[in-house]
Amino acid sequence: MRRTFFKAKIHRATVTHADLEYEGSVSIDEDLLEAAGIWEYEAVHVWNITRGTRLQTYAIKGERGSGIICINGAAAHLNRPGDMVILATFAELEEAEARDFKPTVVLVDRQNKIVAKDAVEVPGPARRVTA
Protein backbone atom coordinates (compact mmCIF):
# COMPACT_ATOMS: atom_id res chain seq x y z
CA MET A 1 0.00 0.00 0.00
CA ARG A 2 1.23 3.49 -0.83
CA ARG A 3 1.02 6.21 1.79
CA THR A 4 1.65 9.93 1.59
CA PHE A 5 4.55 11.25 3.65
CA PHE A 6 6.08 14.63 4.34
CA LYS A 7 9.09 14.81 1.97
CA ALA A 8 10.78 18.19 2.48
CA LYS A 9 10.31 21.70 3.71
CA ILE A 10 11.93 25.09 3.73
CA HIS A 11 11.03 26.30 7.21
CA ARG A 12 10.24 29.91 8.19
CA ALA A 13 11.20 31.48 4.87
CA THR A 14 10.42 35.16 4.36
CA VAL A 15 8.28 36.17 1.37
CA THR A 16 10.32 38.69 -0.63
CA HIS A 17 7.82 39.43 -3.41
CA ALA A 18 4.15 38.87 -4.29
CA ASP A 19 3.36 39.20 -8.01
CA LEU A 20 -0.38 39.21 -8.67
CA GLU A 21 0.11 39.58 -12.45
CA TYR A 22 2.23 36.42 -12.91
CA GLU A 23 0.35 33.28 -14.01
CA GLY A 24 0.91 31.30 -10.80
CA SER A 25 3.50 29.33 -8.82
CA VAL A 26 6.06 30.27 -6.20
CA SER A 27 9.54 31.37 -7.29
CA ILE A 28 12.14 29.92 -4.92
CA ASP A 29 15.88 30.65 -4.83
CA GLU A 30 17.51 27.77 -6.71
CA ASP A 31 19.94 27.18 -3.79
CA LEU A 32 16.95 26.53 -1.52
CA LEU A 33 15.27 24.23 -4.04
CA GLU A 34 18.44 22.13 -4.32
CA ALA A 35 18.99 22.02 -0.55
CA ALA A 36 15.43 20.78 0.01
CA GLY A 37 15.41 18.43 -2.99
CA ILE A 38 12.39 20.21 -4.47
CA TRP A 39 12.20 20.05 -8.26
CA GLU A 40 10.99 22.79 -10.54
CA TYR A 41 7.24 22.33 -11.23
CA GLU A 42 6.84 20.07 -8.19
CA ALA A 43 3.69 20.65 -6.12
CA VAL A 44 4.42 22.81 -3.08
CA HIS A 45 2.27 23.68 -0.09
CA VAL A 46 2.64 27.27 1.15
CA TRP A 47 1.70 27.64 4.82
CA ASN A 48 1.71 31.28 5.85
CA ILE A 49 2.78 31.57 9.49
CA THR A 50 2.03 35.30 9.60
CA ARG A 51 -1.54 35.16 8.23
CA GLY A 52 -2.59 31.56 8.84
CA THR A 53 -3.40 30.91 5.17
CA ARG A 54 -2.58 27.70 3.32
CA LEU A 55 -2.45 26.95 -0.37
CA GLN A 56 -0.94 24.58 -2.89
CA THR A 57 0.90 25.65 -6.04
CA TYR A 58 4.09 24.58 -7.82
CA ALA A 59 7.72 25.62 -7.55
CA ILE A 60 9.71 27.47 -10.19
CA LYS A 61 13.37 28.38 -10.03
CA GLY A 62 14.24 31.80 -8.67
CA GLU A 63 17.61 33.46 -9.09
CA ARG A 64 20.33 31.44 -7.35
CA GLY A 65 21.69 33.10 -4.21
CA SER A 66 19.04 35.84 -4.25
CA GLY A 67 16.95 34.55 -1.35
CA ILE A 68 13.84 35.11 -3.46
CA ILE A 69 10.52 33.68 -2.32
CA CYS A 70 7.95 35.20 -4.68
CA ILE A 71 4.31 34.17 -4.43
CA ASN A 72 2.83 34.49 -7.91
CA GLY A 73 -0.66 34.85 -9.33
CA ALA A 74 -3.86 34.80 -7.29
CA ALA A 75 -1.97 33.43 -4.26
CA ALA A 76 -0.39 36.90 -3.96
CA HIS A 77 -3.70 37.96 -2.36
CA LEU A 78 -2.90 35.62 0.56
CA ASN A 79 0.82 36.35 0.98
CA ARG A 80 2.72 39.63 1.24
CA PRO A 81 6.42 40.57 1.34
CA GLY A 82 7.69 40.13 4.89
CA ASP A 83 5.31 37.26 5.70
CA MET A 84 6.91 34.13 7.13
CA VAL A 85 6.02 30.86 5.36
CA ILE A 86 6.72 27.16 5.34
CA LEU A 87 7.17 25.62 1.87
CA ALA A 88 6.48 21.87 2.05
CA THR A 89 6.29 18.89 -0.30
CA PHE A 90 4.93 15.38 0.12
CA ALA A 91 5.66 12.05 -1.59
CA GLU A 92 3.86 8.75 -1.99
CA LEU A 93 5.98 5.86 -0.73
CA GLU A 94 5.57 2.12 -0.56
CA GLU A 95 5.72 0.66 2.92
CA ALA A 96 9.21 -0.80 2.39
CA GLU A 97 10.77 2.50 1.26
CA ALA A 98 8.90 4.49 3.91
CA ARG A 99 10.46 2.55 6.80
CA ASP A 100 13.89 4.19 6.35
CA PHE A 101 12.75 7.44 4.76
CA LYS A 102 13.73 10.70 6.44
CA PRO A 103 12.41 14.05 5.22
CA THR A 104 14.67 16.98 4.38
CA VAL A 105 14.24 20.03 6.59
CA VAL A 106 15.97 23.26 5.53
CA LEU A 107 16.04 26.06 8.08
CA VAL A 108 16.62 29.59 6.85
CA ASP A 109 17.20 32.99 8.42
CA ARG A 110 15.17 36.13 7.67
CA GLN A 111 17.19 36.71 4.48
CA ASN A 112 16.37 33.15 3.34
CA LYS A 113 19.96 31.99 3.73
CA ILE A 114 20.40 28.39 4.84
CA VAL A 115 21.29 28.03 8.52
CA ALA A 116 20.74 24.25 8.84
CA LYS A 117 19.83 21.27 6.68
CA ASP A 118 18.43 17.88 7.65
CA ALA A 119 17.49 19.26 11.03
CA VAL A 120 15.66 16.96 13.39
CA GLU A 121 12.23 18.36 14.16
CA VAL A 122 11.70 18.97 17.86
CA PRO A 123 8.39 20.51 18.93
CA GLY A 124 8.22 23.53 21.16
CA PRO A 125 9.94 26.88 21.63
CA ALA A 126 13.45 25.38 21.87
CA ARG A 127 13.22 24.74 18.11
CA ARG A 128 12.53 28.35 17.10
CA VAL A 129 14.90 29.89 14.55
CA THR A 130 15.55 33.54 15.25
CA ALA A 131 18.67 34.14 13.14
Swiss-Prot record:
It is an enzyme of class 4 (lyase). Its cofactor is pyruvate. One of its GO terms (cellular component) is cytosol. Its EC number is 4.1.1.11. Catalyzes the pyruvoyl-dependent decarboxylation of aspartate to produce beta-alanine. Gene3D superfamilies: 2.40.40.20. It catalyses: L-aspartate + H(+) = beta-alanine + CO2. It is found in: Cytoplasm. Pathway: Cofactor biosynthesis; (R)-pantothenate biosynthesis; beta-alanine from L-aspartate: step 1/1. This is Aspartate 1-decarboxylase. PANTHER family: ASPARTATE 1-DECARBOXYLASE (PTHR21012:SF0). One of its GO terms (molecular function) is aspartate 1-decarboxylase activity. GO terms for biological process: alanine biosynthetic process; pantothenate biosynthetic process. The gene is panD. Heterooctamer of four alpha and four beta subunits. Binds 1 pyruvoyl group covalently per subunit. Is synthesized initially as an inactive proenzyme, which is activated by self-cleavage at a specific serine bond to produce a beta-subunit with a hydroxyl group at its C-terminus and an alpha-subunit with a pyruvoyl group at its N-terminus. The active site is at 25 (schiff-base intermediate with substrate), 58 (proton donor). Belongs to the PanD family. It holds the Pfam family Asp_decarbox. Substrate binds at residues 57, 73-75. The modification Pyruvic acid (Ser) is found at residue 25. InterPro entries: Asp_de-COase-like_dom_sf, Asp_decarbox. Keywords: Autocatalytic cleavage, Cytoplasm, Decarboxylase, Lyase, Pantothenate biosynthesis, Pyruvate, Schiff base, Zymogen.
